[in-house]
Amino acid sequence: ALAVGRDLVQRRLAEALADRAAPVVAMSGEVVLGQGRAMLTAIVCVDFQAVGQWAQEHGVAYTSYAELSQQPQIYDLIGGQLAEVNAHLPHGLSVARFVNLHKEFDPDDGEVTRTRKLKRNVIDDRYGPIIEAMNAGQEQIDFRAQITYENGQTGTLDRVLRLSDVKGAA
């Protein structure tokens, strides 16, 4: 049931993002995960341009995408958008928890194709510890990720990521 629910939620999120009536379309990429797990969770990549503008208008200081994505006000913004989507979903098929990822999904990292189609198996494998931490109810996770730079070199990035509940999730 969660696999079907995951796909329904993914479609509803895409529809909500396409709805330009929203004051801020804050997500540029998201993946809803739930197959084989107790709840639906979301890994969100914030839209740097839209959220950056929102942050500037609301006095939220940041120096990088990673810093912006982890600001409490941005978690509130994303949580509110997820709660709005949840309000239109059947009981039990709402996103219960989410994380704002410290980076955007990137073709160079193998997470999406060049046409921006998500590679779920790669995301599930790479971000498995985050997904498990969300399902375990943790409030944050120390996450180490390998990254690929535009010049092809690789490096390691350590981040503390906040894990958050979506208000009103059933």
Predicted feature locations:
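AMP-binding adenylation
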Residues: A1-A170
